[in-house]
Curated annotation (Swiss-Prot):
<feature type="compositionally biased region" description="Low complexity">
    <location>
        <begin position="459"/>
        <end position="471"/>
    </location>
</feature>
<dbReference type="GO" id="GO:0050821">
    <property type="term" value="P:protein stabilization"/>
</dbReference>
<keyword id="KW-0991">Intellectual disability</keyword>
<dbReference type="GO" id="GO:0051083">
    <property type="term" value="P:'de novo' cotranslational protein folding"/>
</dbReference>
<dbReference type="GO" id="GO:0019901">
    <property type="term" value="F:protein kinase binding"/>
</dbReference>
<comment type="subunit">
    <text>Component of the TTT complex composed of TELO2, TTI1 and TTI2. Interacts with ATM, ATR, MTOR, PRKDC, RUVBL2, TTI1, TTI2, SMG1 and TRRAP. Component of the mTORC1 and mTORC2 complexes. Interacts (phosphorylated form) with PIH1D1 which mediates interaction of TELO2 with the R2TP complex composed of RUVBL1, RUVBL2, PIH1D1, and RPAP3.</text>
</comment>
<dbReference type="GO" id="GO:0005737">
    <property type="term" value="C:cytoplasm"/>
</dbReference>
<keyword id="KW-0779">Telomere</keyword>
<dbReference type="GO" id="GO:0000781">
    <property type="term" value="C:chromosome, telomeric region"/>
</dbReference>
<feature type="site" description="Interaction with PIH1D1">
    <location>
        <position position="491"/>
    </location>
</feature>
<feature type="region of interest" description="Disordered">
    <location>
        <begin position="627"/>
        <end position="651"/>
    </location>
</feature>
<keyword id="KW-0539">Nucleus</keyword>
<protein>
    <recommendedName>
        <fullName>Telomere length regulation protein TEL2 homolog</fullName>
    </recommendedName>
</protein>
<feature type="modified residue" description="Phosphoserine">
    <location>
        <position position="836"/>
    </location>
</feature>
<feature type="modified residue" description="Phosphoserine">
    <location>
        <position position="487"/>
    </location>
</feature>
<comment type="function">
    <text>Regulator of the DNA damage response (DDR). Part of the TTT complex that is required to stabilize protein levels of the phosphatidylinositol 3-kinase-related protein kinase (PIKK) family proteins. The TTT complex is involved in the cellular resistance to DNA damage stresses, like ionizing radiation (IR), ultraviolet (UV) and mitomycin C (MMC). Together with the TTT complex and HSP90 may participate in the proper folding of newly synthesized PIKKs.</text>
</comment>
<keyword id="KW-0472">Membrane</keyword>
Length: 837
C-alpha cells in the first residue's frame, strides 16, 4: 500500500484546488495566508519538518499555480493591490532558486507580448533589485547532498548567466533596463561580493562553505565576454576587502582556483586588465600560477606571446605579480628567456605583426627591470646569444620600426646583462615609443612616487630668485648706487638694430658659370670652396643651359652618382640628388638608360642603388607634370628653352631666375587689390603633352630585366630585400606617372608579372611595395584596357589580394590589399552594372 499523504501534502493540494477554481477574493486571500505558514511568515508557524517538506516538494507547484492564475481580473478581486502584494511575496520570500526558475520558466513560456509576460518580467526585476540573486548563490555555496542537486546547479548556472539573452529575446522592444547586459552583469558582480562576504562570515562561524558555484558563474560570464562589467565591479571591492584580511584573500584564491579550465583564460585576462598594480593582482591570485597548469600557460605564454591586447601598465602588473613572490620568480626568469628567444627569432620577426613585436619588446624590458643581477648572471650566455641573434635579424629588416626596436632593446639588454663590458650604442630617432621603452628599462624606486616628485618641485618653482639682474650688475654693486645710471644703461634702446638677415658669407672662389666648368670642378678641383660652389650652382646651370647639359649629360650623371662629400656641406645629399634629377629631366632617355644600367652593375653600394631609384622617381614626376613643356619662361631667363623649374631649384642661390621689377610691382598690386567680380570664367592652365610619354619605357623596363639574377655583391632575392622593396615602390610610382601614355598597358602587364613572381615574399616591406604596385596598375589604366588586355592577371590577383587582406600578419599589407580589392570592385561595378530585377 502507498503511504498516506502527509498533512502538508493534503493542505497544499487543497490550496492549489482553491486557487485554481475560486473567484472569491477573500477565499483566495485566506488560502494564500494559510500557505505562508510554511514560509515562517504567519502565526502559528509550521513545524521545521513541515517547512522543509513544503520547500523541497511543494513550493514550485504552488508558484506555478500562482503564475497560471495571473490576470488583470484575478488581481482585482481584492482592492488596493492587496492580492497582488501577497501573490508577489511568495516569489520574493520563499526559496530563491525555485522562485527564480519558475519566473524564468513562465517568462520563456509566455506566448507573445501579454499582461502576464510583462508582470512576470517586472517581478523578476524586483527579484534582482531586492538581492534575491545573492540569496540564490548563497544557498548553492552550502554543502548539499540532495538528489538532483548537480542538475539543479547546472540549470541555475545557465539561467543566471544567460538571463539578459533570454529576456531580450522575449521582451524585445519592451525590455527593461535591469536586463540590459551592461546593467545586469554589474549587478551580478555586486551580488558575488555579497556572497563572498557571506562565505567569509560562515567560515568565521565555523561552518563549511564552497565557492565553486560562484566560480562557475564568474567563469561563464567572462566566457560570454562580460569581463569588463562584472570584474569592473568585483575587482575594486575585492582589492579593498583583501587589503587587511587574510581570510578574504584565501576566499579569493579559492574563487579563482575553482574556475573551470575552459574559462580560466577569460577570467585571468579580465583580472589582469582590471587589477591596478601587481600588489592587487597578487592578493587576488596568490600562487595560482604555480599550482594550476592552465593558469601558468595563460599567464606566462598566451598573454605574452600570442596576444598584444595588454597595455603597458597591465604588462607591468602581470610581470610584477610574478616577481613579488620567491615561488614565482623562477617563472619570471624563464619568461625572460622565452621572450628573448622569440624576440630574436627571424621567423617571428617576419611573420609577427608589429604591435605584437612591440608587446614582446616591452615585456623583455619589464622583466629585466624586475630581475636582479645575481639572477641574470647564471643565464648570461643564453640571454646574450638570443639578444645578438635578434639584433642581427632586426637590423636586416626593411621596416624602420623593427630596426628601431632592435636598437633600443639591444642597448638595454646588453647594459643589464653584461654591465662590465663595452656598451652597445646605436643612433636612432627618438620618438614617444623609444622614450617609453627606455623608461620601462629604468623604473623609479618604490618610494619615488608622483606625490614625492610633486612636493620636491613645488619649492623650486615657488621660490623667488636669489638675486635680481639689477643686483648683480657691476659685480654686485648695491642697487642704491645704480639709481642714477638707468638712463646710461638704456641709452642705446632708441637705436634700430641693423638688418643682417640678407648677409651672405664671403667666398674666395667664384661659382662656375658653365656646366662643363662644374663638371671639371667636381672631378679635378682640390679647392674645397670651388667644389662646393660648383655643386650648389649646378642645378640652376643645368636648367638654364639644356643644350650644353645634353652634350655632357651622361658624364655629368656618372660624376654625380659617384660623388662623395669632401667636406661638411650642409644639405649635400639634397644638392646632389636635385642636380641628378635636373640632368635626368633635361636629357631623359640617355640618362635614364645609364642610371638603370648602373642599378644592376657591380661595385655599387645599396645607398647608391636606392639613390638611382629616388632620382628616377623624382625625374619622372617632373617630366609628367602638366605645363612642363612649352611653359612661358620667366622674364630675365637667359634661354627661351628653359623647362619648368622645380620649387627646390628656384630656392637655391645659384639657380634663382632674376625677376623683372615690373613683374614684382604687378604682383604686389594684384595681391593688394580686392575684386568683387570678374567678367568671364577664369581659364585653367593650358594643356600640354607629357614629356614622360616618350621616355617612360627607358625608366621602367630596364629595372625589371635582371631582378632575379644575383650578383656577387647584390642579391635582390636574398639579403638585399630592402632595395627590392624600394624597387617595388618605385615601379608602382612610375606606373602611376605613366597614366594615359601609350606604353602604359605594356608597363602594367609587366608590373603584374613582377608582382606575381614575388607575391609570397617573406619581407613585409616588399609585400607592401607589391600591393601598392597592383593599386597603381588599377588606377593608371583605363577600365576597358584592363578587361581587354589584363583580365587573366586581374583574376589571379583577386584571390591573392583576398588572402592577404585576411591572413597577412602585417597591418599595412592588409590595408593595402583591401584598397586594391575595393578598386577591383569599383572597376567591376563600373563595367558590369547590376541587372534590373
Amino acid at each position: 500500500m502507498e503511504p498516506a499523504p502527509s498533512e502538508v501534502r493534503l493542505a497544499v493540494r487543497e490550496a492549489i484546488h482553491a486557487l485554481s477554481s475560486s473567484e472569491d477574493g477573500g477565499h483566495i486571500f485566506c488560502t494564500l495566508e494559510s500557505l505562508k505558514r510554511y514560509l515562517g511568515e504567519m502565526e502559528p508557524p509550521a513545524l521545521p519538518r513541515e517547512k522543509e517538506e513544503f520547500a523541497s516538494a511543494h513550493f514550485s507547484p504552488v508558484l506555478r499555480c500562482l503564475a497560471s492564475r495571473l490576470s488583470p481580473a484575478w488581481l482585482e478581486l481584492l482592492p488596493h493591490g492587496r492580492l497582488e502584494e501577497l501573490w508577489a511575496s511568495f516569489f520574493l520570500e520563499g526559496p530563491a532558486d525555485q522562485a527564480f526558475l519558475v519566473l524564468m520558466e513562465t517568462i520563456e513560456g509566455a506566448a507573445g507580448p501579454s499582461f502576464r509576460l510583462m508582470k512576470m518580467a517586472r517581478l523578476l526585476a524586483r527579484f534582482l533589485r531586492e538581492g534575491r540573486l545573492a540569496v540564490l548563490m548563497e544557498a548553492q555555496c552550502r554543502q548539499q547532498t540532495q538528489p538532483g542537486f548537480i542538475l539543479l546547479r547546472e540549470t541555475l548556472l545557465g539561467k543566471v548567466v544567460a538571463l539578459p539573452d533570454h529576456l531580450g529575446n522575449r521582451l524585445q522592444q519592451e525590455n527593461l533596463a535591469e536586463f540590459f547586459p551592461q546593467n545586469y552583469f554589474r549587478l551580478l558582480g555586486e551580488e558575488v561580493v555579497r556572497v563572498l562576504q557571506a562565505v567569509v562570515d560562515s567560515l568565521q562561524g565555523g561552518l563549511d562553505s564552497s565557492v565553486s558555484f560562484v566560480s562557475q558563474v564568474l567563469g561563464k560570464a567572462c566566457v560570454h565576454g562580460r569581463q569588463q562589467e562584472i570584474l569592473g565591479v568585483l575587482v575594486p571591492r575585492l582589492a579593498a576587502l583583501t587589503q587587511g584580511s587574510y581570510l578574504h584573500q584565501r576566499v579569493c584564491w579559492r574563487l579563482v582556483e575553482q574556475v573551470p579550465d575552459r574559462a580560466m583564460e577569460a577570467v585571468l585576462t579580465g583580472l589582469v586588465e582590471a587589477a591596478l598594480g601587481p600588489e592587487v593582482l597578487s592578493r587576488l591570485l596568490g600562487n595560482l600560477v604555480v599550482k594550476n597548469k592552465k593558469a601558468q600557460f595563460v599567464m606566462t605564454q598566451k598573454l605574452l606571446f600570442l596576444q598584444s591586447r595588454l597595455t603597458t601598465p597591465m604588462l607591468q602588473s602581470l610581470l610584477g605579480h610574478l616577481a613579488m613572490d620567491s615561488q614565482r620568480r623562477p617563472l619570471l626568469l624563464q619568461v625572460l628567456k622565452e621572450l628573448l628567444e622569440t624576440w630574436g627569432s627571424s621567423s617571428a620577426i617576419r611573420h609577427t605583426p608589429l604591435p605584437q613585436q612591440r608587446h614582446v619588446s616591452k615585456a623583455v624590458l619589464i622583466c629585466l627591470a624586475q630581475l636582479g643581477e645575481p639572477e641574470l648572471r647564471d643565464s648570461r650566455d643564453e640571454l646574450l646569444a638570443s639578444m645578438m641573434a635578434g639584433v642581427k635579424c632586426r637590423l636586416d629588416s626593411s621596416l624602420p620600426p623593427v630596426r628601431r626596436l632592435g636598437m633600443i632593446v639591444a642597448e638595454v639588454v646588453s647594459a643589464r646583462i653584461h654591465p662590465e663590458g663595452p656598451p652597445l650604442k646605436f643612433q636612432y630617432e627618438e620618438d614617444e615609443l623609444s622614450l617609453e621603452l627606455l623608461a620601462l628599462a629604468s623604473p623609479q624606486p618604490a618610494g619615488d612616487g608622483a606625490s614625492e616628485a610633486g612636493t620636491s618641485l613645488v619649492p623650486a618653482t615657488a621660490e623667488p630668485p636669489a638675486e635680481t639682474p639689477a643686483e648683480i650688475v657691476d659685480g654686485g654693486v648695491p642697487q642704491a648706487q645704480l639709481a642714477g645710471s638707468d638712463s646710461d644703461l638704456d641709452s642705446d634702446d632708441e637705436f634700430v638694430p641693423y638688418d643682417m638677415s640678407g648677409d651672405r658669407e664671403l667666398k674666395s672662389s667664384k661659382a662656375p658659370a658653365y656646366v662643363r666648368d662644374c663638371v671639371e670642378a667636381l672631378t679635378t678641383s682640390e679647392d674645397i670652396e670651388r667644389w662646393e660652389a660648383a655643386l650648389r650652382a649646378l642645378e640652376g646651370l643645368v636648367y638654364r643651359s639644356p643644350t650644353a647639359t645634353r652634350e655632357v649629360s651622361v658624364e655629368l650623371a656618372k660624376v654625380l652618382l659617384h660623388l662623395e662629400e669632401k667636406t661638411c656641406v650642409v644639405g649635400f645629399a639634397g644638392l646632389r640628388q636635385r642636380a641628378l634629377v635636373a640632368v635626368t629631366v633635361t636629357d631623359p632617355a640617355p640618362v635614364a638608360d645609364y642610371l638603370t644600367s648602373q642599378f644592376y652593375a657591380l661595385n655599387y653600394s645599396l645607398r647608391q642603388r636606392m639613390d638611382i631609384l629616388d632620382v628616377l622617381t623624382l625625374a619622372a614626376q617632373e617630366l609628367s607634370r602638366p605645363g612642363c613643356l612649352g611653359r612661358t619662361p620667366q622674364p630675365g631667363s637667359p634661354s627661351p628653352n628653359t623647362p619648368c623649374l622645380p620649387e627646390a631649384a628656384v630656392s637655391q642661390p645659384g639657380s634663382a631666375v632674376a625677376s623683372d621689377w615690373r613683374v614684382v610691382v604687378e604682383e604686389r598690386i594684384r595681391s593688394k587689390t580686392q575684386r568683387l567680380s570678374k567678367g568671364g570664367p577664369r581659364q585653367g592652365p593650358a594643356g600640354s603633352p607629357s614629356r614622360f610619354n616618350s621616355v617612360a619605357g627607358h625608366f621602367f623596363f630596364p629595372l625589371l630585366q635582371r631582378f632575379d639574377r644575383p650578383l656577387v655583391t647584390f642579391d635582390l632575392l636574398g639579403e638585399d630585400q630592402l632595395v627590392l622593396g624600394r624597387l617595388a615602390h618605385t615601379l608602382g610610382a612610375l606606373m602611376c606617372l605613366a597614366v594615359n601614355t601609350t606604353v602604359a598597358v605594356a608597363m602594367g602587364k609587366a608590373l603584374l608579372e613582377f608582382v606575381w613572381a614575388l607575391r609570397f615574399h617573406i619581407d613585409a616591406y616588399v609585400r607592401q611595395g607589391l600591393l601598392s604596385a597592383v593599386s597603381s596598375v588599377l588606377l593608371s589604366l583605363p577600365a576597358a584596357r584592363l578587361l581587354e588586355d589584363l583580365m587573366d592577371e586581374l583574376l589571379e590577383a583577386r584571390s591573392w589580394l583576398a588572402d592577404v587582406a585576411e591572413k597577412d600578419p602585417d597591418e599595412d599589407c592588409r590595408t593595402l590589399a583591401l584598397r586594391a580589392l575595393l578598386l577591383l570592385q569599383r572597376l567591376k561595378n563600373r563595367l558590369l552594372p547590376p541587372a534590373s530585377p
